[in-house]
Amino acid sequence: MNRRSCAFIFVTGGVSSSIGKGLTTSALASLMQSMGFRVCIRKMDPYLNVDPGTMSPLQHGEVFVTEDGTEADLDLGHYERFTGINCTHRDSTTAGRIYVDLIERERNGEYLGATVQVIPHVTNLIKDFIYSGSDQYDVILCEIGGTVGDIEGQPFFESARQVAYEVGKENVIYIHLTLVPYLEASGELKTKPSQHSVKALNALGIQPDFLICRTQSAQMSAADKRKIALFCNIREGNVIEAQDVDNIYKIPLIYKEQGLDTKISALLGCGPLEAGVSHWKEIVGRTRSLANSGKKLFVAIIGKYSGLCDAYISVDSALQHAAFAVGVNLSVQIIDARGKDMSDLSKFDMILIPGGFGNNGIDGKLLAITHARINNIPFLGICFGFQLAILEFARNVVGIKDADSTEFNKNCKAPVICFLDEWHRSDSSVERRRQSSQVGGTMRLGGYNCVLKKESKAYAIYNETEVISERHRHRYEANPHYLPELEAKGMLFSGYSEKGCDIPEILELKDHPWFLGVQFHPEFKSRIFKPHPLFLSFVRAGLLRKYS
């Protein structure tokens, strides 16, 4: 379905943050894909950080890394997993990035002495981001982070208003998500917060075309929808209910059942097209049957951000993708490496240590690695987990008692993990970093090739592919000086960076059924319809150990 001009769908939220804008945007994009539209999804975050790379996962959830090395909001992970389309730097921005660009332009004299203001200068830069590459798509879906009424979000809402003015309202749709709370004491749903949220949006010059009402257990009545439609000046049929679900892949089906797909296509002047959802029905049906499966695995994610499940959302998703493909019910528990739950890991069939930074909780993580190594429990270490697996092995097997990482101890006597100061980009140019560089600028980010050793477990897992590509986010690496000692005791480094610097990328233990560490982040490339081979093999190893 090729439209003569690109349409823009803006997804906004009110009443509460974390209301599901990213999942709604992802689900809508997948529905529009199935109708034949060429879609693109973009995220605009109003916070003043240039990117989320230096933000605490406890505040903002995980940092998602795109193929081109962009550190982005976790919603881009949802976008990729629902649509299968890889996002780039053109699909994510923040108020901080916009203002940095603005100040640089002003300092370079690009505004020719004009008084630089929010309107038109900031809004013009935001619109440049929105319009970028629009000739390649039929529909661009733009999610505005935060909630209506946030002071830092006003330039983004104003830009969304201006887009309709510039391209014509017939080419723009506004979708607003609100929370409809249920008061147990009175036994009723309350619509007033939604009314006030839409009123605040109206004050910014935007009248939503659709209102998606998030509810919990109580279902909205026809009277509730009529009331909201009347007070919010929205067609009754365009008031969509979105109840909490136990499986996010039900969301496209929920919107399809209420005709959101046909209503959007009709509003865009393309007729009442219908989305194909048979693939989502299959996913939901199979996951429902897995919940009743007799085979169940328990996996522990040992981290330090246990207070927020979104901190490891891509890892959890990748595990569930693999479990779905293998046909096993998987229970994932995030364990605080500093907490009392570390005292008993015997109930877990698999152990995973994800990416992270700093020495907080490393003792617990090292204990978990030792437990997995000694007891032949399937183990996967990702990024920081890869480095800690080397550290544990160096101390407890090789006998390097002073083994440490310069991340924790800059003056350590045996730096088995050290600062990564040079590597080759995909275009063969050399990237260099110093420890004195800005914190946000010392990472090796994005997709890089890795060469696998034949006859290794990794080579078999990747279907005997000699060169693979994975996404990275790290500033420390295994110190090549210590690799011979480690390999002499049974640790095989089965993957290395492809060009020039020979950075160790994959480790495995020769005398362990399944013990792997990877310097990269395989979770970022896993999809529900194409699970990542490492996670598939990891889950199969857990299944084999428990049920063989």
Curated annotation (Swiss-Prot):
<dbReference type="GO" id="GO:0046872">
    <property type="term" value="F:metal ion binding"/>
</dbReference>
<dbReference type="InterPro" id="IPR029062">
    <property type="entry name" value="Class_I_gatase-like"/>
</dbReference>
<comment type="pathway">
    <text>Pyrimidine metabolism; CTP biosynthesis via de novo pathway; CTP from UDP: step 2/2.</text>
</comment>
<dbReference type="InterPro" id="IPR017456">
    <property type="entry name" value="CTP_synthase_N"/>
</dbReference>
<keyword id="KW-0436">Ligase</keyword>
<feature type="binding site">
    <location>
        <position position="227"/>
    </location>
    <ligand>
        <name>UTP</name>
    </ligand>
</feature>
<feature type="binding site">
    <location>
        <begin position="150"/>
        <end position="152"/>
    </location>
    <ligand>
        <name>CTP</name>
    </ligand>
</feature>
<feature type="binding site">
    <location>
        <position position="475"/>
    </location>
    <ligand>
        <name>L-glutamine</name>
    </ligand>
</feature>
<keyword id="KW-0547">Nucleotide-binding</keyword>
<protein>
    <recommendedName>
        <fullName>CTP synthase</fullName>
        <ecNumber>6.3.4.2</ecNumber>
    </recommendedName>
</protein>
<feature type="binding site">
    <location>
        <position position="17"/>
    </location>
    <ligand>
        <name>UTP</name>
    </ligand>
</feature>
<dbReference type="Pfam" id="PF00117">
    <property type="entry name" value="GATase"/>
</dbReference>
<feature type="binding site">
    <location>
        <position position="17"/>
    </location>
    <ligand>
        <name>CTP</name>
    </ligand>
</feature>
<dbReference type="InterPro" id="IPR027417">
    <property type="entry name" value="P-loop_NTPase"/>
</dbReference>
<feature type="active site" description="Nucleophile; for glutamine hydrolysis">
    <location>
        <position position="383"/>
    </location>
</feature>
<dbReference type="InterPro" id="IPR017926">
    <property type="entry name" value="GATASE"/>
</dbReference>
<feature type="binding site">
    <location>
        <begin position="384"/>
        <end position="387"/>
    </location>
    <ligand>
        <name>L-glutamine</name>
    </ligand>
</feature>
<feature type="binding site">
    <location>
        <position position="75"/>
    </location>
    <ligand>
        <name>ATP</name>
    </ligand>
</feature>
<feature type="binding site">
    <location>
        <position position="143"/>
    </location>
    <ligand>
        <name>Mg(2+)</name>
    </ligand>
</feature>
<feature type="binding site">
    <location>
        <position position="227"/>
    </location>
    <ligand>
        <name>CTP</name>
    </ligand>
</feature>
<comment type="similarity">
    <text>Belongs to the CTP synthase family.</text>
</comment>
<keyword id="KW-0665">Pyrimidine biosynthesis</keyword>
<dbReference type="InterPro" id="IPR004468">
    <property type="entry name" value="CTP_synthase"/>
</dbReference>
<feature type="active site">
    <location>
        <position position="523"/>
    </location>
</feature>
<feature type="binding site">
    <location>
        <position position="407"/>
    </location>
    <ligand>
        <name>L-glutamine</name>
    </ligand>
</feature>
<comment type="function">
    <text>Catalyzes the ATP-dependent amination of UTP to CTP with either L-glutamine or ammonia as the source of nitrogen. Regulates intracellular CTP levels through interactions with the four ribonucleotide triphosphates.</text>
</comment>
<feature type="binding site">
    <location>
        <position position="75"/>
    </location>
    <ligand>
        <name>Mg(2+)</name>
    </ligand>
</feature>
<dbReference type="GO" id="GO:0042802">
    <property type="term" value="F:identical protein binding"/>
</dbReference>
<dbReference type="GO" id="GO:0019856">
    <property type="term" value="P:pyrimidine nucleobase biosynthetic process"/>
</dbReference>
<dbReference type="InterPro" id="IPR033828">
    <property type="entry name" value="GATase1_CTP_Synthase"/>
</dbReference>
<keyword id="KW-0479">Metal-binding</keyword>
<dbReference type="GO" id="GO:0044210">
    <property type="term" value="P:'de novo' CTP biosynthetic process"/>
</dbReference>
<feature type="binding site">
    <location>
        <begin position="18"/>
        <end position="23"/>
    </location>
    <ligand>
        <name>ATP</name>
    </ligand>
</feature>
<keyword id="KW-0315">Glutamine amidotransferase</keyword>
<feature type="domain" description="Glutamine amidotransferase type-1">
    <location>
        <begin position="305"/>
        <end position="548"/>
    </location>
</feature>
<feature type="active site">
    <location>
        <position position="521"/>
    </location>
</feature>
<dbReference type="GO" id="GO:0003883">
    <property type="term" value="F:CTP synthase activity"/>
</dbReference>
<feature type="binding site">
    <location>
        <begin position="190"/>
        <end position="195"/>
    </location>
    <ligand>
        <name>UTP</name>
    </ligand>
</feature>
<dbReference type="GO" id="GO:0005524">
    <property type="term" value="F:ATP binding"/>
</dbReference>
<dbReference type="GO" id="GO:0004359">
    <property type="term" value="F:glutaminase activity"/>
</dbReference>
<feature type="binding site">
    <location>
        <position position="356"/>
    </location>
    <ligand>
        <name>L-glutamine</name>
    </ligand>
</feature>
<comment type="subunit">
    <text>Homotetramer.</text>
</comment>
